[in-house]
Amino acid sequence: MGINKKDGQPQYAPSHLGTKPVKYKRNKGEKFHDKSNGHPIVMQTKGE
C-alpha cells in the first residue's frame, strides 16, 4: 500500500530519478536541437 496513485504515474513507473531510460532524455534533446541552420531565426517582437 505504499504506492500513491494520485500523482498520475502508472503503477509500474519508478518515481525516483535515474531509473528512466537514457533514450527518453536523448529524444527530448534531439527535438529541441536544430542542426539545419547555423544561427537561429530571430523574430522581432513588440517592444524589442
From Swiss-Prot:
The gene is sspN. It is found in: Spore core. GO terms for cellular component: endospore-forming forespore. It comes from Bacillus velezensis (strain DSM 23117 / BGSC 10A6 / LMG 26770 / FZB42) (Bacillus amyloliquefaciens subsp. plantarum). Residues 27-37 have a biased composition (Basic and acidic residues). Residues 1-48 are annotated as: Disordered. One of its GO terms (biological process) is asexual sporulation. HAMAP family: SspN. It holds the Pfam family SspN. Belongs to the SspN family. Induction: Expressed only in the forespore compartment of sporulating cells. This is Small, acid-soluble spore protein N. Keywords: Sporulation. InterPro entries: SASP_SspN. Its main location: other.
